[in-house]
Amino acid sequence: FISLMKVLPVPMRFAKPGARLLALIKPQFEAGREDVGKGGVVRDEAVRERVCRDVAAWLDGQGWAVQGLTTSPITGPEGNVEFLIAAQRAS
């Protein structure tokens, strides 16, 4: 269970200007333990929204422009709602 904000910095260093990123935001990996319910499911929509905002803001701070964010059509095995985020590295 590792946050995108901990996993992505190393591979992002190798991305050339204009590179594109598509990542799966798994709220149960991004939210604090107090926000994750039984079975690892984040049921609170406000927590899911906060997680998406946090990841988008982090990407922006790393020099990546968020181009889109959408709910994944596939839920996690326990019913977690997950999100796809697209971003492009500044030229």
Regions found by a protein language model. Name each.
Residues I25-D44:
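Short, glycine-/aromatic-enriched active-site segment of Class I SAM-dependent methyltransferases
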Residues I74-S91:
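Core SAM-dependent methyltransferase catalytic element
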Residues M5-L22:
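A short glycine-rich, Lys/Arg-flanked "PGG" loop and its adjoining helix->strand segment in the class I
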Residues W64-P73:
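Conserved S-adenosyl-L-methionine
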Residues R48-Q62:
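Short alpha-helix
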Residues I2, Q28-A31, I74-T75:
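Conserved nucleotide-binding/hydrolysis micro-motifs of P-loop NTPases
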Residues F1-L8, E49-C52:
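Amphipathic alpha-helical transducer elements in NTP-driven molecular machines
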